[in-house]
Regions:
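N-terminal membrane-anchoring/stem segments of glycan-assembly enzymes
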Residues: 1-41, 334, 361
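Cell-envelope/extracellular polymer assembly enzymes that use nucleotide-activated donors
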Residues: 45-48, 77
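Acidic donor-binding segment of Leloir-type glycosyltransferases
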Residues: 65-112
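Long helical/loop segments within the catalytic core of UDP-sugar-dependent glycosyltransferases
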Residues: 100, 104-112, 117, 121, ...
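Short aromatic/hydrophobic "clamp" motif used to bind/position activated sugar donors
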Residues: 122, 134
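Acidic donor-binding/catalytic loop of UDP-sugar-dependent glycosyltransferases
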Residues: 138-154
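Catalytic donor/gating beta->alpha subdomain of glycosyltransferases that bind UDP-sugars
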Residues: 162-164, 168-184, 219-285
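Membrane-embedded multi-pass helical conduit in multi-pass membrane proteins
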Residues: 292-374
Length: 381
């Protein structure tokens, strides 16, 4: 007669319980709210779109046209702010502006070398904007269709002062990077929907010119070279006045980032995040989301190894079941959550993408520790 020891019962119960907790404590179970498909008012307010460029002639040639071909019932302007030394880009913009009344371009002087040129470009673009509502984006992005502006601006009304849009990475981008971007969106966009916006990694942000000018733009963050979208949301988001637009017609498509651009974005975040407020609750939530899946994985593997060593086949079966339960549940939950945003990410790779996050984060921290910290400051202050 087979007897089941107390150790087997307790260890088996613990690993199964941890597998359940490790599956349910999950950012992909905290769903995002999607806007009702019913359209709001047919009319729209005039709006300005700001694109900041630096050595982005190729991207502008491929992406700018779609910004200029939006079907929009009111006037809109696309302001491209480049640098005075970028002669080829200025020549291209001059030709395009002659053909399209929506396009306006300007540049920052070469002498602006002791402050963040990116933030100076944005500030100059805001001052040049004719309209109250402004959408800020990048030359490496393009609208998914000609309804982008119309769909994005349905939120540009009272009581909103900030609108966060979604940006999908081009399908040529590595699956793990597309996964990481979507996972961050579940934290950051949901946070903006529920309370205060914390930051955004997606360059599709609408804000009010009057707010930006009244609060002196990037004052408080000028010492950092980048972090312009993070700080914009962190400074200007208030409780209840931030909208999130997830309709696929409002998406922007981001060109495949180079390895350098991808890693630099993480390095600049490491440098500038210390200036962001409202970070504690986000960090605590993310820590819990990492702790329980990894604790469950380690417990299941350790129990499985122990059970095999002790030839406790009942416990071996329970530990194996707990391990499979954890991996299958997390994979199914992640796949169901992200398929709205990207249905091309392999379901078989999802467990590796999820459990690789802490190692990718560690690699980013090591790169930052080894980097020259002066590279992240403008030396202005």
């Amino acid at each position: 007669m087979m007897t089941i020891s107390l150790t087997t019962i307790i260890a088996g119960a613990v690993v199964v319980l941890l597998a359940i907790l490790g599956s349910l404590i999950n950012p992909f179970l905290r769903s995002l709210r999607f806007t009702d498909e019913e359209e709001s008012l047919e009319s729209r307010e005039p709006i300005s779109v700001i694109i900041t460029a630096h050595d982005n002639l190729y991207e502008l040639e491929h992406n700018l046209q779609m910004f200029l071909q939006q079907k929009y019932p009111a006037d809109y302007q696309v302001i491209v702010v480049c640098q005075s030394t970028d002669g080829e880009t200025l020549d291209y913009l001059k030709r395009m502006a002659a053909e399209n009344p929506h396009l306006y371009y300007t540049y920052i002087p070469e002498s602006s070398r002791y402050m963040s040129r990116k933030k100076l470009q944005i500030t100059l673009g805001v001052k040049a904007a004719k309209y109250e509502w402004i959408i800020l984006t990048e030359p490496t992005c393009t609208p998914s269709n000609d309804k982008w502006l119309y769909t994005m601006t349905r939120n540009c009304q009272e009581p909103n002062h900030l609108v966060l849009g979604y940006v999908a990475l081009d399908e040529a981008t590595k699956g793990v990077r597309r996964f990481d971007s979507i996972r961050k969106a579940f934290y950051l966009l949901r946070r903006a929907q529920l309370s205060y916006g914390y930051r955004t990694h997606m360059p599709n942000v609408a804000f009010r010119k009057s707010d930006f000018m009244r609060e002196q733009g990037y004052q408080g963050n000028l010492e950092y070279v980048r972090g312009e979208y993070d700080f914009l949301v962190n400074k200007y988001a208030a409780y209840g006045d931030t909208a999130v637009e997830l309709d696929c017609d409002a998406w922007l498509i981001h060109d495949e980032p180079t390895d350098k651009a991808w890693h630099n974005a993480h390095l600049y975040l490491q440098a500038s995040r210390k200036s962001l407020t409202r970070a504690k609750s986000m960090k605590s939530q993310m820590a819990m989301d990492h702790l329980f899946p990894h604790l469950s994985l380690i417990a299941s593997l350790a129990t499985l190894a122990y059970a095999i060593l002790m030839q406790d086949w009942i416990l071996t079966g329970i530990a194996g079941f707990a391990l499979l339960l954890l991996l299958i549940l997390r994979t199914v939950i992640a796949h169901k959550a992200i398929k709205h945003f990207d249905d091309d990410i392999s379901i078989l790779k999802l467990p590796f993408y999820e459990y690789g996050i802490i190692w990718r984060n560690l690699a980013n921290k090591i790169r930052y520790w080894r980097a020259d910290k002066n590279d992240f400051t403008s030396h202005k202050l």
